[in-house]
Amino acid sequence: MADQYHGVMQKIHDHTPNPTQILGFITLFVSGAILLLLTGLTLTGTVIGLVVLTPVLIFFSPILIPVATVLFVAVAGFLSAGGFGLAALSAISWLYNYIKGRHPPGADQIDYARMRIADTASHVKDYAREYGGYLQSKIQDAAPGA
């Protein structure tokens, strides 16, 4: 009977958590309790704020909504103007560097596109010249005295 008792006690002792695990569990429990308390306080404050401020917001909404709309449009306009100004300044700076030959990023693509356009225009001009000569000979064949 004593052996059984010692065997059971040994199993219980083997499965008990060590002090580090106990300290970790206590820390976890305390942190969870604090976060739960803060969540409750936040929710309570939000509900109280809504209960107090909702009648005020409804009463002043004919004034607040147009003011908020005007402020939103004004801020959006200023931010857009600043963004467009920055984009224009960047484009002018890039163009200045390109004209001065400082080789800004993307200049190779611009040069390649310019050469392709010039090459295509040259091919179109040659084709038009050939086709124009062909039409001229057809006109002379159709009306020899013309």
From Swiss-Prot:
TM regions (residue ranges): 22-42, 56-76, 77-97
Gene Ontology annotations of biological process type: lipid storage
Highest taxon in the source lineage: Eukaryota
Record-linked InterPro entries: Oleosin
Alphabetical UniProt keywords: Acetylation, Lipid droplet, Membrane, Transmembrane, Transmembrane helix
UniProt comment concerning the protein's domains: The proline-knot motif may be involved in targeting to lipid bodies.
Motif (Proline-knot): 55-66
Topology within the bilayer: Multi-pass membrane protein
PTM sites of type N-acetylalanine: A2
Official protein name in the record: Oleosin
A cellular component term, taken from the record's GO annotations: membrane
Lineage: Eukaryota, Viridiplantae, Streptophyta, Embryophyta, Tracheophyta
Tissues with expression: Expressed in pollen (at protein level).
Places the protein is found: Lipid droplet; Membrane
PANTHER family: F27J15.22, OLEOSIN
Species of the source: Pinus elliottii (Slash pine)
Family, as annotated: Belongs to the oleosin family.
